């Protein structure tokens, strides 16, 4: 269950007053995570056409070693192709959000680690992918866990974000599961 707090919402226009569960993410202190990086969330890539050695890549120990190792692989003719998610449950959950979600996220991860952007708006340049990734993020925020089979249901109705300045933002989806 993604619910951290339960609140009653009062809609003054409809007089609708549901009791809803919300997840809480705080920007105070460390940046909040949407999904925990674990073995369940690993993406596996296959290196094709590589003309170097494993040592050529693994000897790189710079402060930006992932980016530098990816650059070295490409310099030596290598191309990284998404192979699979390490965890089958995570893969299945991603495909429930969209049948191509593992491939979309694999592409986004590569772009991020190559230094091609830090924000989704910089890493996703296709309108359809943008919409699908937002749907995935909603699923992660409201119901999906990486290592547990997901049935498509949301276990909370929204998100409370505590901003760095202490302001609160409330995002809610009240009747989404009734569609």
Locate each region found by the language model:
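Short, positively charged
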Residues: 1-2, 8-179
């Amino acid at each position: 269950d993604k619910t951290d707090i339960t609140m009653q919402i009062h809609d003054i226009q409809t007089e609708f007053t549901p009791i809803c569960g919300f997840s809480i993410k705080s920007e105070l202190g460390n940046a909040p995570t949407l999904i925990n990086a674990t073995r369940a969330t690993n993406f596996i890539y296959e290196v094709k056409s590589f003309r170097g050695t494993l040592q050529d890549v693994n000897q790189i120990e710079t402060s930006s070693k992932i980016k530098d190792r990816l650059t070295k692989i490409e310099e030596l003719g290598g191309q990284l192709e998404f192979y699979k998610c390490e965890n089958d449950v995570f893969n299945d959950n991603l495909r429930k959000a969209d049948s191509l979600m593992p491939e979309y996220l694999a592409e986004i991860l590569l772009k991020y680690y190559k230094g091609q952007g830090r924000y989704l708006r910089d890493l996703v340049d296709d309108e359809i992918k943008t919409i699908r990734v937002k749907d995935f993020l909603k699923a992660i925020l409201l119901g999906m866990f990486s290592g547990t089979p997901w049935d498509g249901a949301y276990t909370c109705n929204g998100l409370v974000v505590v901003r760095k300045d202490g302001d609160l933002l409330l995002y809610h989806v009240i009747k989404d599961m009734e569609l």
